[in-house]
Each structure stands twice: as C-alpha cells, then as structure tokens.
From Swiss-Prot:
It is a multi-pass membrane protein. This is Membrane protein insertase YidC. Belongs to the OXA1/ALB3/YidC family. Type 1 subfamily. One of its GO terms (biological process) is protein transport. Residues 40-76 have a biased composition (Low complexity). The keyword ATP-binding does not apply. GO terms for cellular component: plasma membrane. Its main location: membrane. One of its GO terms (molecular function) is membrane insertase activity. HAMAP family: YidC_type1.
Length: 598
C-alpha cells in the first residue's frame, strides 16, 4: 500500500501543479489581457478626442544609424487609406490585396483560405492594413543615403509601375524610381502560391559621383493584437539572428527597452502571432544590425527592422540585392518547405514548438500522418494516443508489475509496522532491506507518470499552436478542436434558452473525461487515509471544471487516454495475477457503512 500511497501523493502534487499552472499560464493572462485591452481602448478614445488625423504620410527623419521608424498613424477607414496612393493589385490562390506604390509597402493583404470564425461566410483574415488605419500593419524595404546621393527610396517615395500591373503567382511586377542624382532603382516583386514574396532590387548609377547607400527592411505594427496572450505561446518579436540564434521577445519587454542584437550575417526577423506571421529575410551575405523597437508617439507602434552596412555604387556600375518577405499563415509543411528551399536557418521555429521541440514537432508529424489518412484531426488525435500508449506499454507493464509485487508484500509490510510501531527509523531501514531482498524498486511505478508529463504538454502545444487544428472539426457538435467544447450542462446542452455563468460551463466532453478519470482511479483501492480518500474522490470533479475551458481536442485526448489506460491496466494486472478491483470499488461506493460497535 506504500507504493500506492506514494503514487497518490505524486498524482496529487501533479494535479495541484497543473491547476496552479493553468491558473497562472492561462487564466491570469486572459484576465490581464482583457484589462489592458480595456485600458488601451479608453486611452485611444481619449487620444482621438484631442488629436486630429494627419493629412497623409510624412517622410520620417532618416539617419545613418537606424532604419526609418515610420510616423504616428492617422485614423482612417480602410477604403479611405487605400485611395490615398496608387496601388498594384495582388491576387494569388492564397492571398489578395495590393502593394502601396508610396514606399512600395506591402500593407494590404488578406488570407483567402482562412475565415475569422468556423462559418465560411464570415470575413476572411486580414493580415496587413495601411498605416493610416487603426491597426496598421505592413512591411517595407528601402534605402538610407546622404545629401550627396539625393532622394532614395523610403517610406514616402512614389514608385512607378506599368499600367494595369497585377501581381500573381505567375506574373511578377516591376517597379522603378529614378532620382535627380542619376540613381535608378528597379524593383521586381514576385510571389509564390502561398506566402513568400521575393523582392529583387537593382541599383544603377548613371551619375557622376559614387553613391553610398544602406538598405533597410522593417515590419511595423500599430497596436498589439487584442486576442488574449498566454505564457505557453510566444507572440511578439521573433528572429534568428547570427550567433544569437533564436530570439523571442514579448511586446511588453520591448516597451521597457529596445532590443538590439549584435551585428550579424544571415538569419531573419519579424513579428509573430499565434497563427500568422510577417518576417523579412535580409540578403544572407551582408552584415546587418537588427532592432526590435517600440514607439509611443500617437498610437503604440512596434517595429522589427534591420539595416545593413553601407555599400558604394560607383558611376557606371550597378548592384543587386534580394530580400524575402514571408506574410501569411504558419502552416507547418509550408514553413518547413521554405526553410529547406531557401536555406533559411531555423525558420521552422517561427512556429512555437516550445521546450519539448524534439517531442512536439514529431508528435505533430505523426498526427498529420493520421490526418492525411483519415481526413479528421479528431480521429488523428485518437490514433496518436494509441501509438503513444503502445510505446509506453513496456513501462506501464513494469509499473503494474511493481504494484503487484508491492501488493504481494503487504502482509510482510504489516508485520514490520507492528514490529517497529514505535521506531520510525527502524521501520524505514527494515522496509528498505525488505525491498532489497525481494528485488523491488519502490519508485518504479513513478517513472511512467513522470515520462508522460512531457507527452501531455507537447500534445497540448500541438493542439493549441498549430494552425492545422484551427477550426478543425471532430464529430457532432465539435466544430473546432482548438476551442473549448461549446456545450454546457447549465442549459442542458442547449435545450434551455440561456447560457448561465461562464464559471459553471461544463460541456459534454469534459463530463466524459471526468467519468473516465473516475473509473480509472477506481481501478485501485481507495486510500485508507481519509484526507487522501477525499482528494481521491474529488479529483475527477475538479479536473472536469478545470478542463472545461481547454481546447476540445485536448479534452478528447484525455478522455480517450483514460479509457485506454483502464483497458491497459486491466490487461496488465490480469497478466500479473493481480485482482482488478474496479467493480468491487464501485460497489463499495453504494454500500451502507456499518455502524461502529459499542
């Protein structure tokens, strides 16, 4: 029974950690995000009352020390902003929008394959919008020069494009700009069928003097996302920059202090959301300085940018540069494909696989394999769980073999307790000697529990972060595996015309999970200690309410895992000659307790 008690204490400790972790990592950030969103909205309303919208974009001050930071955004509707300057239409299988010829900005982009809700008639996702709108978000590539070089392409430079130009996956567009010093900039923009833009620039010097230039690239965003952030997921600045490797910086950290990694060669940088991202891959052979910055003038503005070392274009010569711009959904095979085909270092880390990367990503690959076969990610979760249980079967077998041996040792353990009733140290020494003689490892039963913790959190990451799970249906009422079960027992699962308090929302799948957890715990004898027994009885109920707000896919996994565990434990216990006490324990719940003898 000591082994069982030890396992109970471990389970209790883990349960407490999970509950506290859930509160700290999930609920607290949601509450804080809602509070900040309300404060930001109030501050914005106050700002709009005293600040008149700027009339058009103004060229920011440009220095040789950093990329342009943009300007405080005006507040205009999308339609008004799109009419302020000429544009080139973007139309591909995955994207729609336009390129702003003022600055050659990519600032109008929608993702055709994704809707805001599970309803296909809902609006498609807007990734980029012009700086003049409330939540402006764009990428821009330009140059920094000196008075001697004349005007060079920057935020307000008006490029020219052929009449009727249209960017598709098959037809690139070519933009051009010539200044009064004889510098001609020719920019060819192409895009593939998904989300990667290639921007190839050619600079020709037809003037009389050498031209010293630096190129820059930036991803600029006005205001933070309004979706609640959680600590298990990184949203904000991201990049793989030279020897510094992967850098993930929260918005809040940059608000306190700008981040400027060491000068580097190679890599990429940008801004990432849960499902979407915008990144720039600079020319990989040139040294550059990267910056993650925050600007508080006007609307809050966040910027990831780079500026490369100065280079010189001699008279009569030309130079060519190429940048890559990723703007779209973080689809796993697409991201992996870009990493391989463009040799972008660690580009797959754009998806937040977490600390258990070596488990999380292979688990997604396995799940994706089953999805391709069955066409349903819910079924893929069930199949993946079976594979994981099969892999852990030898460990589980050892665990229950250890439990069987411990149960066989109970009579001897009781004798030792009676013999050393007043000698705690002597009991411990005698117990350890008994373990040694019988070749029993008292902690053998703990390893399967400990080893499955990374598996659980890795699966949670897969379900929570991968866009493939977004709006992925199961069967029946589950239309989105990445969202909580929408049903609730409060209104009898939709039969009554009200919702009830959110705290009491308890869907069908959390109920199923609670029942399976209850049955699994009844496979073992109830602890003799009253406190342990009380926790033993209440744990399924606590977990039901705790998991009610978790993604439905995770709850389905847990319920299915419990079911498989019951079957697995019963099989192993029979193989080792241990009585399965499930039905006896269930019957014991309904037996009337005998009155104590007087």
């Amino acid at each position: 029974m000591m082994e069982n008690n030890r396992n109970y204490f471990i389970a209790i400790a883990l349960s407490v950690l999970i509950v506290l972790g859930w509160q700290f990592l999930y609920m607290n950030p949601r509450i804080e995000a809602q509070r900040k969103a309300q404060e930001a909205q109030k501050a914005q309303q106050q700002t709009e009352q005293v600040q008149q919208p700027a009339a058009g974009g103004q060229t920011p001050a440009q220095t040789s020390g950093a990329a342009p930071s943009g300007q405080a955004a005006a507040t205009a509707t999308l339609e008004q902003a799109l009419q302020k300057s000429p544009r080139v239409v973007i139309d591909t299988p995955a994207l729609s929008g336009s390129i702003n010829l003022a600055g050659a900005r990519l600032d109008d982009l929608k993702l055709k394959g994704y809707h805001e809700t599970v309803d296909d008639s809902s609006p498609i996702i807007t990734l980029f919008s012009p700086a003049e709108t409330k939540d402006g978000y764009f990428t821009e590539l330009g140059y920094i020069g000196s008075d001697a070089t004349g005007s060079v392409p920057g935020p307000s430079t008006l490029w020219t494009a052929p009449e009727g130009a249209k960017l598709t996956e098959k037809t690139p567009v070519t933009l051009s700009y010539t200044n009064d010093k004889g510098l001609t900039f020719t920019r060819t923009i192409s895009v593939d069928e998904r989300y990667m833009f290639t921007v190839a620039d050619k600079i020709e010097n037809t003037g009389q003097a050498p031209a010293a230039l630096s190129s820059y690239g930036r991803v600029t965003r006005y205001n933070k996302p309004t979706t609640p952030s959680v600590y298990v997921l990184h949203e904000g600045f991201i990049g793989v920059i030279g020897d510094d490797g992967l850098i993930e910086t929260k918005y809040s950290a940059v608000e306190k202090e700008a981040v400027a990694p060491a000068k580097s060669t190679g890599g990429w940088l940008g801004i990432t959301d849960k499902y979407w991202a915008a990144t720039i891959v600079p020319p990989q052979s040139a040294a550059y300085e990267a910056h993650f910055s925050y600007f508080a003038d006007g609307q809050p503005r966040y910027q990831a940018d780079y500026k490369d070392d100065a280079f010189t274009v001699a008279p009569g010569q030309s130079i060519e540069l190429k940048n890559l711009v990723f703007a779209g959904a973080k689809e796993v095979p697409v991201i992996d494909g870009y990493e391989a085909s463009y040799s972008i270092p660690k580009f797959d880390r754009l998806i937040d696989w977490g600390w258990f990367y070596f488990i999380t990503k292979p688990m997604f690959k396995l799940m994706d394999f089953f999805f391709r076969y069955f066409g349903n990610f819910g079924v893929a979760i069930l199949c993946t769980t079976i594979v994981v249980k099969a892999l852990f079967f030898p460990l589980a077998s050892k665990q229950y073999a250890s439990m069987a041996n411990m149960k066989r040792m109970q009579p001897k353990m009781e004798e030792l307790k009676a013999k050393f009733a007043d000698d705690r140290m002597g009991l411990q020494q005698a117990t350890m000697q008994l373990y040694k003689e019988e070749k029993i490892n008292p902690i053998a039963g703990c390893w399967p529990v400990a080893l499955q913790i990374p598996i659980f959190f890795s699966l949670y990451k897969v379900i929570y972060i991968t866009i493939e799970m977004r709006h992925a249906p199961f069967f029946g009422w589950i239309k989105d595996l990445s969202a909580p079960d929408p049903t609730t027992i409060v209104n009898l699962f939709g039969l009554l015309p009200f919702e009830g308090p959110t705290l009491l929302h308890l869907g069908v799948w959390p109920l199923i999970m609670g029942v399976t957890m209850f049955v699994q715990m009844r496979m073992n004898p109830t602890p003799p200690d009253p406190t342990q027994a009380m926790i033993f009885n209440w744990m399924p109920l606590v977990f039901m309410f705790m998991l009610a707000s978790f993604p439905a896919g995770l709850v389905i996994y847990w319920a299915w895992n419990n079911t498989l565990s019951v079957a697995q434990q019963g099989l192993i216990m029979k193989r080792h000659g241990v009585k399965v006490e499930l039905f006896d324990n269930l019957k014991g719940l309904f037996r009337r307790k005998e009155a104590p003898s007087k």
